[in-house]
Every structure is written in C-alpha cells, then in structure tokens.
Amino acid sequence: MVRFKHRYLLCELVSEDARCRLSLDDRVLGGLVRDTIARVHGAFGAAACSVGFAVRYLNAYTGVVLLRCRKDFYQLVWSALPFITYLENKGHRYPCFFNTLHVGGTIRTCQKFLIQYNRRQLLILLQNCTDEGEREAIKKSVSRSCLLDREPVEELSDSAGEEVAEAME
C-alpha cells in the first residue's frame, strides 16, 4: 500500500475590508484557488492540482487558511497564489491577497509554526503600543482568552474526579 504524500501551505488572507474575511467559505476559497491555478497553469495545472487539493482549515476571524495539495505539485499551487487579487462571494468583490506563511509536510508542523508566528505578532503588537493603557488592555485580553480556554478542561476533570469518588464509595 502506498501512502500519498502531501504538502500543506499555511497562508494568510490579507484584506483591508473586514467583511472579506467574515464572508469566507472553504468551498468558495477552494474554487477560487482552483480557478486561479487553471488560469495560470492551464489544463495541466488544473488537472494535476485537483486530485489532492483541499482547504483543510479556515479561520474567518484571523484569515488563516491551510491548503493541502500533493507533494509533487505544491509549487503549482504556491506559484498561483500571488495571482489571487480579489475574493468574490455572494455578489460582492473584495480586494485581497494571499501571504504564504509556511510550507510544511504535516498539519502539526504548520500548527507549531502558526503558534510561533502568533507569538511574534503579539510581541510586535506589544512593542508598538504607545502608552501603558493599551499594553495592559492587550495583556488582559490575552490572559482572559487563555483562562477561558482552560476553564472547561478543569471543569471536566473536577466532575470526572467526583464521579470516580462516587463510584469508589
């Protein structure tokens, strides 16, 4: 049995209009990339990339997109991304472009890179703060979001511990 090797392109959709990112849909985005590949590389590029191509992850709030394609043809996808200059969805046309952040062999390596990238962006954001009030607001927001992520896990472990204690009695 042969394993198909893939490449994952971690991209960021950059647009000045916030409505562009919020109106994202993985099917629309996948179709846009496929159409661009066909326009740039012709029938060969469209056929070569259509076999293993998929949008694996899409975050509409941050504009982060993870594209999967076959290892042999990832350069065709990568070279077609700069030719995407707009996103058309529901009759609206939004100017945008793709910024390729990372090319990896697994989803896990892309996740690790994205965590490091977000940490660097947060550090830059904190360094560019003009006063202490902005810096404290950002720190409070980040710590609040971290606490919200951890609370459900603690609640689950507490309730599981109580169930184990009841079962032992």
UniProtKB/Swiss-Prot annotation:
<dbReference type="InterPro" id="IPR016819">
    <property type="entry name" value="RNase_P/MRP_POP5"/>
</dbReference>
<feature type="modified residue" description="Phosphoserine">
    <location>
        <position position="157"/>
    </location>
</feature>
<dbReference type="GO" id="GO:0001682">
    <property type="term" value="P:tRNA 5'-leader removal"/>
</dbReference>
<dbReference type="GO" id="GO:0005655">
    <property type="term" value="C:nucleolar ribonuclease P complex"/>
</dbReference>
<keyword id="KW-0539">Nucleus</keyword>
<dbReference type="Pfam" id="PF01900">
    <property type="entry name" value="RNase_P_Rpp14"/>
</dbReference>
<protein>
    <recommendedName>
        <fullName>Ribonuclease P/MRP protein subunit POP5</fullName>
    </recommendedName>
</protein>
<keyword id="KW-0698">rRNA processing</keyword>
<dbReference type="InterPro" id="IPR002759">
    <property type="entry name" value="Pop5/Rpp14/Rnp2-like"/>
</dbReference>
<comment type="subunit">
    <text>Component of nuclear RNase P and RNase MRP ribonucleoproteins. RNase P consists of a catalytic RNA moiety and 10 different protein chains; POP1, POP4, POP5, POP7, RPP14, RPP21, RPP25, RPP30, RPP38 and RPP40. Within the RNase P complex, POP1, POP7 and RPP25 form the 'finger' subcomplex, POP5, RPP14, RPP40 and homodimeric RPP30 form the 'palm' subcomplex, and RPP21, POP4 and RPP38 form the 'wrist' subcomplex. All subunits of the RNase P complex interact with the catalytic RNA. Several subunits of RNase P are also part of the RNase MRP complex.</text>
</comment>
<dbReference type="GO" id="GO:0000171">
    <property type="term" value="F:ribonuclease MRP activity"/>
</dbReference>
<dbReference type="GO" id="GO:0033204">
    <property type="term" value="F:ribonuclease P RNA binding"/>
</dbReference>
<comment type="similarity">
    <text>Belongs to the eukaryotic/archaeal RNase P protein component 2 family.</text>
</comment>
<dbReference type="GO" id="GO:0000172">
    <property type="term" value="C:ribonuclease MRP complex"/>
</dbReference>
<dbReference type="GO" id="GO:0004526">
    <property type="term" value="F:ribonuclease P activity"/>
</dbReference>
<dbReference type="InterPro" id="IPR038085">
    <property type="entry name" value="Rnp2-like_sf"/>
</dbReference>
<dbReference type="GO" id="GO:0008033">
    <property type="term" value="P:tRNA processing"/>
</dbReference>
<comment type="function">
    <text>Component of ribonuclease P, a protein complex that generates mature tRNA molecules by cleaving their 5'-ends. Also a component of the MRP ribonuclease complex, which cleaves pre-rRNA sequences.</text>
</comment>
<keyword id="KW-0819">tRNA processing</keyword>
<dbReference type="GO" id="GO:0006364">
    <property type="term" value="P:rRNA processing"/>
</dbReference>
<keyword id="KW-0597">Phosphoprotein</keyword>
<feature type="modified residue" description="Phosphoserine">
    <location>
        <position position="159"/>
    </location>
</feature>
